[in-house]
């Protein structure tokens, strides 16, 4: 027996798959059929449901240049541990670990910190070790 809240044969909502017409927003994972468009609802599909009319901004290929709107400024970030082989990830070095935490105590992602994948994993492990030993905070402040 199909439950009415789980996207059964007679249900239009629920958890359904990409083509079932279910989905959180009513249109599967972004199929756009039925209600909204994917998880975010509204729009023309996709996870955020932000497709459809782009208004005054235009599409990426209309912004000029061969790159399709990519911005060409800024320097490529280099992993500081790969650049300087003498540096090691050390959970006991609080002054080094502060560069990889926000003010609230969250680990900074590698697209911002510039770490390579290998060293970002080491940094995350070191931060978690430091948190367990009360060297680094789990969170700062409160509500």
Swiss-Prot record:
Entry GO MF terms: small ribosomal subunit rRNA binding; structural constituent of ribosome
Compositional bias annotation for Basic and acidic residues: 51-70
SUPFAM superfamilies reported in the protein's UniProt record: Ribosomal protein S18
GO biological process, one term: translation
Gly residues: compositionally biased ranges: 10-50
Pfam families: Ribosomal_S18
Region (Disordered): 1-72
Keywords recorded for this protein, A-Z: Ribonucleoprotein, Ribosomal protein, RNA-binding, rRNA-binding
One GO location term (cellular component): cytosolic small ribosomal subunit
InterPro entries assigned: Ribosomal_bS18, Ribosomal_bS18_sf
Function: Binds as a heterodimer with protein bS6 to the central domain of the 16S rRNA, where it helps stabilize the platform of the 30S subunit.
Subunit and partners: Part of the 30S ribosomal subunit. Forms a tight heterodimer with protein bS6.
Family affiliation: Belongs to the bacterial ribosomal protein bS18 family.
UniProt protein name: Small ribosomal subunit protein bS18
């Amino acid at each position: 027996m199909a439950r009415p809240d789980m996207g059964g044969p007679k249900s239009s909502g629920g958890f359904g798959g990409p083509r079932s017409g279910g989905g959180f927003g009513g249109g599967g994972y972004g199929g756009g059929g039925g209600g909204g468009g994917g998880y975010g609802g509204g729009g023309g599909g996709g996870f955020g449901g932000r497709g459809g009319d782009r208004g005054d901004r235009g599409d990426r290929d209309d912004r000029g240049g061969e790159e399709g709107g990519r911005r060409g400024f800024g320097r490529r970030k280099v992993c500081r541990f790969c650049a300087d082989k003498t540096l090691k990830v050390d959970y006991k070095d609080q002054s080094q670990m502060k560069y990889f935490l926000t003010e609230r105590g969250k680990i900074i992602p590698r697209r911002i910190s510039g770490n390579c994948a290998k060293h970002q994993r080491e940094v995350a492990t070191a931060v978690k070790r430091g948190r367990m030993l009360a060297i680094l905070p789990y969170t700062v402040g409160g509500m």
